[in-house]
A protein has these predicted regions:
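Long, well-ordered core segments of solenoidal/helical folds
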Residues: 4, 9, 54-66, 97-120, ...
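Aromatic-rich carbohydrate-recognition surfaces in CAZymes
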Residues: 79-106, 111-196, 229, 353-367, ...
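The feature captures the catalytic groove of carbohydrate-active enzymes
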Residues: 1-22, 121-138, 169-256, 290-292, ...
Length: 554
């Protein structure tokens, strides 16, 4: 391995790289970041420089908001914390780096919950705001993952569980006026789909800014919304896990009852919002007609763990990896590319076509839930290539050129960079007690330039400092300065938190052949893309081999 790359990582000062701090609380944020041990270095290209620029801008997105504790803000022109994004998927990613900020962000929504159970759709300097619902990523999933990553604090879990239970009741009471079991959209902003043709001829906000009311003079409202319904389905599945963990055994807090409610939501989703011919989820309007706009609703529903792997693979072939649909050069578009209503312009807040960074950070869970690891990297490479030339960290990208679009210092794009680097070539802790060491490097799809060349990454886990080096000759894992594993590039090594080898995963479209050097043994293997090989007693054995779903063009 390159000694110079090791020296570069080990001598790297995060403090020096991010420069002068501006806010009083930034000093504490830097201290917490350094406690995570996370550092990233690259042998060439601009990605290392952009990485620390992103970290510096991340601190700008953290400030007291509606209370005394610093919480995550959306950033850019969005001065506040939104439940659909900042308070869920953004905070879920941030939890691996600055857990105290994520926890404060989650708790701020519980703190500001209305007496009737409604959670604010956003929190600003002026306090909580309730005029719409605005749901996408299930809050319960984000909370559950934070709980698993950081000490399993049952006091935190109970506070959030009770708040989310009350919110579930509010949605069932006020957002099922048609009695279908679906969750209804009363306005565009209920789903955060600004300017999407999905909501043409629908008001931006609920009637008179009352989240429990819709315009009864509308010829098409309310919509039975697949993304809102899928959110509640997934939410209820995670609430069942929480109820079981908290020992709740009766009444509304019974985990069996939560699973029954989740099943009802799933049944309603498929009965009312799924079109079998198109194999797609659509809103159903008040006249019982499908709103046939193919949008990123699909990715949202998939990220809510709806359907089995075969179902998801069909979605990949027909839509998510289809270059006529959502698999643009810089994926994923917010409207299908072959829809005549598709509008690629990214210079303003739009869900009418451009690739939004919120879609990019929601995507990994949808893919990884079904072990589609290789296919996910095909989104990582172009997006990191675009971010490699980032100057502003925008909300949107032009899906054809990757040029930066609307706004700047936007926390989803900042967190996208941190997350994609860790998933592609870093060390990622999982709430189930696994560590992922991924032996890939960013690949520049633009003009043949180099983004990073060889990479180095480190992270502190339970008092041990782990390092991962990805070079042209292969990959190396160190613990507390000592090499514990070497292996060929193109695989992901899965260990426990103590560094004990559990399995490897093929991360390339090509078969990877070579040997793992571990505990004094040279262990030969050949692993296909997405194949998982378990390790036991000095040997690898196949756990699963699901093959690869390839891009489609028609």
């Amino acid at each position: 391995m390159s000694q110079s790359l090791k020296e570069r990582l080990r001598n790297l000062s995060v403090e020096d790289r991010i420069g002068e701090l501006e806010k009083p609380q930034d000093r504490q944020l830097l201290k917490e970041w350094k406690q995570s041990g996370v550092r990233f270095a690259a042998a060439s290209g601009e990605l290392e420089k952009v990485y620390y620029k992103a970290l510096r801008r991340l601190f700008d997105c953290i400030a007291p908001t509606g209370g005394s504790e610093p919480i995550l803000q959306e950033g850019g022109v969005y001065l506040g914390c939104w439940l659909e994004s900042t308070g869920t998927i953004n905070a879920e990613l941030l939890s691996r780096f600055l857990p105290s900020v994520s926890e404060a962000t989650y708790l701020s929504f519980a703190k500001h919950q209305r007496e009737d159970g409604l959670l604010p759709y956003k929190i600003t300097e002026q306090g909580p705001v309730f005029k719409q619902i605005q749901l996408v990523t299930p809050l319960a999933r984000s909370v559950w993952n934070h709980y698993g990553l950081h000490g399993r604090d049952e006091s935190f879990l109970r506070t959030m569980y009770e708040a989310m239970s009350r919110y579930d009741q509010w949605l069932a009471t006020y957002r099922d006026t048609r009695g279908t079991g679906c969750v209804e959209a009363f306005s565009t902003f209920d789903t955060g789909h600004d300017l999407s043709p999905r909501f043409w001829h629908v008001p931006d906000t609920p009637h008179l800014n009352d989240p429990a009311a819709y315009n009864r003079d509308s010829p098409i409202l309310p919509f039975l919304a697949p993304d809102l319904t899928a959110n509640v389905y997934c939410q209820r599945m995670y609430l069942a896990l929480m109820a079981e963990k908290l020992g709740e055994t009766s009444g509304a807090m019974d985990q069996k009852l939560w699973r029954e409610k989740a099943g009802q939501s799933l049944d309603s989703l498929f009965r009312y919002c799924f079109d079998e011919a198109d194999h797609f989820f659509y809103d159903r309007d008040a006249n019982d007609a499908f709103v046939r706009v193919q949008s990123d609703v699909l990715l949202r529903v998939m990220a809510c763990e709806v359907g089995d792997r075969e179902f998801f693979d069909t979605m990949l072939r027909r839509y998510l990896l289809n270059t006529r649909k959502f698999f643009a050069r810089f994926p994923f578009t917010s409207i299908a590319l072959d829809d005549p209503r598709f509008n690629p312009f990214s210079s303003y807040n739009s869900w009418a076509g451009p690739s939004n960074f919120l879609s990019m950070i929601r995507a990994p869970h949808a893919f990884e839930h079904h072990h589609r690891y290789v296919e996910l990297t095909w989104a990582f490479y172009p997006i990191l290539s675009a971010l490699n030339r980032a100057t502003r960290f925008p909300q949107t990208l032009d899906p054809w050129t990757g040029q930066e679009g609307f706004t700047e210092a936007y926390s989803p794009s900042i967190l996208c960079l941190l997350d994609y680097v860790e998933r592609l070539c870093g060390i990622m802790p999982r709430p189930d007690g696994e560590l992922w060491f991924t032996g890939l490097v960013p690949y520049d799809i633009d003009m043949g330039g180099e983004i990073a060349g060889e990479t180095a990454y480190c992270r502190m886990v339970n008092g041990d400092l782990y390092e991962l080096y990805n070079t042209k000759s292969g990959s190396e894992i160190c613990r507390n300065g000592r090499t514990i594993m070497t292996f060929p590039r193109g695989v992901r090594v899965v260990t426990d938190y103590g560094g004990g080898l559990l399995s490897i995963i093929g991360m390339s479209a090509r078969p990877v052949q070579g040997a793992m050097q571990y505990e004094g043994r040279s262990i030969p293997f050949t692993v296909q893309g997405n194949e998982i090989l378990n390790y036991k007693q000095g040997r690898f054995s196949r756990k699963q081999d699901i093959g690869i779903v390839y891009p489609a063009y028609s």
